[in-house]
Amino acid sequence: LRELLGVKFRRLLSVHPENEIYIDYEDETNGKSGSLPVIPIFPQYVSNDQDPPTPYAEDSFEIEGDDGAVYEVEFERGTLDFDAMTSELADDYPGLFTTSGRFRTRFRPNQSKQGVDIYANGRILMTSVFTDLFDLIRNNEYNYFGGEVRIFPKEGTTEVPTDNKKVRVDTNSTLWQNLCEILSSDEYQPEGKRYD
């Protein structure tokens, strides 16, 4: 839960030093209780000097949505540096990691976790989005690919369209359809690492 909240609310937690989330707990087996801080968890990328499969890049562009609304989109991506991400937090927050020193949920080098996070309306709405955005099939070549798509309303609206529960971008919206079309172009496709 701590890692999930640290991923979903990473921008909120890092905007102002007074923004905090704590998880209070009580262990019913031994009566111990305590409080754990939620730490913002951002992706970090392998330097382009190291010739990663997907070089680090950042782009921004505008997309039109329903009823003529305009959105500013920022797309950051690259090859994730899992070692840098864990070593930065391991000493102060060892409970965030498995005994092998990896994150427990979002940032793991496997097929189900590859892809980008979608930021809109003040938080991460979707994580590990891959096949819905890119014209590719998940396979081990993309295990280290990651990034973030940030969507900001610019004209004609104050919010990004979401589903009824407000927990994900409305994938039936014109905004989403246009975003998928743009990110499926060769310019934005991730590069995979072949394991021979």
PLM features: residue spans?
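Charged regulatory segments coupled to nucleotide-binding catalytic modules in large multidomain enzymes
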Residues: 58-196
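Glycine/threonine-rich ATP-lid/beta-loop region of ATP-binding domains
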Residues: 1-107
